[in-house]
């Protein structure tokens, strides 16, 4: 059993340009998380387990004037999200394989005190099974299948389902210094084209603390129920004509004693994005034309710096452009994350972490309002 509460005063989400956020009403955030896990071993080979998690969030939001559509930094509206996640799993382990049969249930509810924003309820049901088999001295293959049904339960009932089969394989060679991974997946959708995707990767240890890695993969991201069917009283709506995103990506990296540098490159065809009409201010999701390109470098360091104290730093430089070679909206070129964890006091965990978001723009091609250029600090104390 576990429980966690995050409560922060925050700052105004719509501070006028050139003004200081402290002059306006704070937009706070509260997150309550409760989780429960139970398991029973029938014998050494058979086990059943279940889990339940509740995530309840409350966010102060700043809305718009219903007549002029001007930002209202002192708006007192509240948005709430309540997620229920449940799982039931049966496991059988024998000398050949580990087999799992499972079901997952997810319910997402969204509500708001703003009369123009209707409630939303979405449900995902999943049933699946997989078998993992060790072979040779240090290789493993996993074969499985699953079924998912996605439902919109508010106002109108809309749904689609997904059936999939998949296989993944890992091989280790030369005293486990070479790790080769492969994965293949076939998805059959009720409302979208069927698709086969895959991934291959390799990691090579030069010495114990130094390794090189490379990965290549394809992806197929279908629109969510929310992106397809949501609507509000402001004129914003989902788009039932959205097409899935098709991605091709690769990355190469080097790591030494907790320090790593990774270059990544992703191409996304039919990227799903949000578009606002500049005249009516009503918006909807759409597929961007052509192929969008996201590439960049991540530099990270994670290690124990003194006894019981761990430092975590990362910097990401991102170039995100659409098919017209224009910078994509709402994506910061520079981002920096930092954190310090201390475990030296029995049963306690102390953490300080933060994130810096660099310059970004509200619309493509560096147009619209300039946002970003802010830092958020967090402090966490856990007792176990």
What are these regions (language model features)?
Residues 1-79, 359:
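Periplasmic-side early beta-strands and strand-to-turn transitions of outer-membrane beta-barrels
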Residues 36, 86-88, 127-129, 165-167, ...:
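Membrane-embedded beta-strands of outer-membrane beta-barrel proteins
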Residues 4, 8-9, 93-112, 205-213, ...:
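Membrane-embedded beta-barrel scaffold of Gram-negative outer-membrane proteins
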Residues 137-142, 172-174, 180, 267, ...:
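Gram-negative outer-membrane beta-barrel transporters
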Residues 2, 39-41, 131, 203, ...:
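Conserved C-terminal beta-signal and adjacent last beta-strands/turns
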Residues 56-58, 65-69, 156-157, 190-251, ...:
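Surface-exposed extracellular loop regions of Gram-negative outer-membrane beta-barrel proteins
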Residues 39-57, 77-205, 259-262, 310-312:
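Face-selective signature of the C-terminal outer-membrane beta-barrel domain
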């Amino acid at each position: 059993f576990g429980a966690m509460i995050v409560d922060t005063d925050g700052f105004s989400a719509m501070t006028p340009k050139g003004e200081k956020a402290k002059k306006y009403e704070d937009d706070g955030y509260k997150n309550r998380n409760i989780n429960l896990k139970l398991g029973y071993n029938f014998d050494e080979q058979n086990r059943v387990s279940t889990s339940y998690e509740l995530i309840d969030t409350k966010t102060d939001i700043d809305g718009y004037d219903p007549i002029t559509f001007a930002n209202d930094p002192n708006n007192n509206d509240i948005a709430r999200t309540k997620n229920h996640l449940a799982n039931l799993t049966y496991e059988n382990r024998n000398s050949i394989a580990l087999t799992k049969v499972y079901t997952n249930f997810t319910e997402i509810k969204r509500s708001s005190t703003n009369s123009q924003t209707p409630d939303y309820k979405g449900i995902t049901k999943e049933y699946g099974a997989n078998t993992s088999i060790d072979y040779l001295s240090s290789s493993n293959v996993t074969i499985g299948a699953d079924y998912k049904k996605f439902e919109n339960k508010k106002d109108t009932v809309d749904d689609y389902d997904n059936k999939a089969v998949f296989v993944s394989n890992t091989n280790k060679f030369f005293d486990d210094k070479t790790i080769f991974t492969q994965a293949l997946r076939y998805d059959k959708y009720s409302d979208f084209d069927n698709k086969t995707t895959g991934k291959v990767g390799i990691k090579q240890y030069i010495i114990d603390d130094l390794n090189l890695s490379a990965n290549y993969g394809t992806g197929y991201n279908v629109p969510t129920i929310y992106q397809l069917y949501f609507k509000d009283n402001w004129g914003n709506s989902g788009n039932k004509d959205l097409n899935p995103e098709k991605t091709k990506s690769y990355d190469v990296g080097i790591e030494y004693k907790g320090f790593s540098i990774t270059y990544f490159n992703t191409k996304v065809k039919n990227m799903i994005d949000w578009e606002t009409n500049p005249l009516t201010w009503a918006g909807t999701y759409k597929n961007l034309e052509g192929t969008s390109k996201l590439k960049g470098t991540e530099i990270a360091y994670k290690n124990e710096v003194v006894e019981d104290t761990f430092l975590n730093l990362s910097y990401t430089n991102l170039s995100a452009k659409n098919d017209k070679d224009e910078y994509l909206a709402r994506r910061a070129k520079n981002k920096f994350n930092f954190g310090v964890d201390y475990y030296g006091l029995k049963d306690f965990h102390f953490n300080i972490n933060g994130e810096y978001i660099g310059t970004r723009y509200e619309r493509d091609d560096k147009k619209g309002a300039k946002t970003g250029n802010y830092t958020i600090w967090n402090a966490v104390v856990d007792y176990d």
